[in-house]
A protein has these predicted regions:
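Fe(II)/2-oxoglutarate oxygenase catalytic core
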Residues: 1-137, 141-171, 177-179
Length: 179
């Protein structure tokens, strides 16, 4: 695991997650990893590889712009060697989460998302009704120079309504089935 989250801060976050089903950690990615991910995202944008986001699992996936209007780029580890350090770190963090919370977390999927001005994703659970394999969702914000007037705060609805500002390098983790 990256040295950023070992010890007391990580333990406090895991305790918060166990009690409230979410946690927030700032300065999540080490600087070199953050720089690599931001550079990769910039290349995805420059090469126009972001696609209109859809909802639903697998073959049921469909675009419904009244529910979700952002753009995404799915990350495929074998094809993205420049992100290997990111994936290696997330492997270690997945293992640490599984150990701390006594969960069987076998895999993960990642995508980059862009929300242009006015874009949205209506309230929803990240776990699909038809499948229970998505247990935990993680959001890592890459917003440089974010200001409140830019909008885009994440609203968690359970256990109580909480607004989380999308500050650069902030990680939000929450249960996919309850928050």
């Amino acid at each position: 695991m990256w040295p950023t989250f070992k010890g007391e801060e990580w333990d406090k976050g895991m305790d918060q997650f166990a009690e409230q089903h979410f946690m927030v950690l700032d300065q999540f990615l080490p600087p070199s990893v953050l720089e690599t991910v931001c550079r990769y995202f910039a290349s995805v944008e420059a090469e126009d590889r972001l696609k209109a986001a859809a909802i639903g699992p697998g073959k049921e996936r469909t675009r419904i712009s009244e529910i979700r209007s952002d753009f995404v780029h799915w990350l495929d580890r074998p094809l993205m060697t420049e992100l290997e350090t990111f994936f290696d770190g997330m492997d270690a963090i997945r293992a640490a989460i599984a150990e701390s919370l006594f969960l069987s977390l076998r895999g993960y999927e990642f995508h980059l998302a862009k929300y242009p001005k006015g874009a949205f994703y209506k309230p929803h659970f990240d776990q699909f009704n038809s499948r229970e394999n998505r247990m935990i969702s993680v959001v890592i914000y890459l917003n440089e120079n974010w200001e409140p007037e830019h909008g885009g705060a994440l609203k968690l609805h359970k256990p109580q309504e909480i607004l989380i500002e999308p500050a650069m390098n902030r990680m939000v983790m929450f249960r996919s089935d309850t928050v």
